[in-house]
């Protein structure tokens, strides 16, 4: 898979795309109680954080997770606004290269 460093989503675009995908698929993958909790608390303590892909993804996908092209977005709730997310609802792996639409999600269980 050939990728172009000059054809990547920005960090903000990556966060936005991951969050849009999360919202679209959450109803089919989260418990109704979790969806209610997330919706009620997101404005005060919710967030999406961008990371390099964690090693855990290697057991779920079979390609090189070069951090130049792949990002992990953690979506969930923090204890308070500005804190690190501790209550994770989804971890989204996205390819940032615009011509390679790859996405995998690990949902809260």
UniProtKB/Swiss-Prot annotation:
It holds the Pfam family DUF440. Gene3D superfamilies: dsDNA mimic, putative. Belongs to the putative dsDNA mimic protein family. May act as a double-stranded DNA (dsDNA) mimic. Probably regulates the activity of a dsDNA-binding protein. NCBIfam families: PRK05094.1 (NF003469). This is Putative double-stranded DNA mimic protein ESA_01547. It comes from Cronobacter sakazakii (strain ATCC BAA-894).
């Amino acid at each position: 898979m050939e990728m172009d460093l000059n054809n990547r989503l920005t960090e903000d675009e990556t966060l936005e795309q991951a969050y849009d995908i999360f919202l679209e698929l959450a109803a089919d993958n989260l418990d109704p109680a979790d969806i209610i909790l997330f919706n009620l608390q997101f404005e005060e303590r919710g967030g999406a954080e961008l990371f390099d892909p964690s090693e855990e993804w290697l057991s779920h996908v079979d390609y090189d997770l070069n951090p130049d092209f792949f990002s992990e977005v953690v979506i969930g709730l923090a204890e308070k606004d500005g804190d690190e997310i501790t209550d994770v609802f989804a971890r989204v792996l996205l390819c940032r290269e615009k011509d390679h639409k790859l996405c995998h999600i690990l949902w809260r269980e």
